[in-house]
Amino acid sequence: MPKLKTRKAAAKRFKVTGTGKFMRRRAFRNHLLDHKSTKLKRHLATKAVVDERDADNVSLMLPYS
């Protein structure tokens, strides 16, 4: 059986934690930041955990993670 291919777009967007969960970047921190508060921008700079309902799809895209 051939090796499974990794979806490169997903590999750039998600990282796996030691417990097997996936970390992702938060949205809304790309542009149009003038009217957003410093507190909000600081919060958006942190990583978030991928929801458990989406984790199965992410793991299919990253077979060797």
Curated annotation (Swiss-Prot):
SUPFAM superfamilies referenced in this protein's UniProt entry, alphabetically: L35p-like (SSF143034)
A biological-process GO annotation: translation
Gene3D superfamilies xrefs: 4.10.410.60
Disulphide bond pairs: none
Keyword list, A-Z: Ribonucleoprotein, Ribosomal protein
GO molecular function, one term: structural constituent of ribosome
GO cellular component: cytosolic large ribosomal subunit
Pfam families in alphabetical order: Ribosomal_L35p
Segments crossing the lipid bilayer: none
InterPro entries named among the record's database cross-references: Ribosomal_bL35, Ribosomal_bL35-like, Ribosomal_bL35_CS, Ribosomal_bL35_sf
Keyword Lyase included in the entry's annotation: no
Record NCBIfam families: rpmI_bact
Family: Belongs to the bacterial ribosomal protein bL35 family.
PANTHER family (UniProt xref): 54S RIBOSOMAL PROTEIN BL35M, LARGE RIBOSOMAL SUBUNIT PROTEIN BL35M
Name of protein: Large ribosomal subunit protein bL35
Organism, as annotated: Prochlorococcus marinus (strain MIT 9211)
Gene symbol of the encoding locus: rpmI
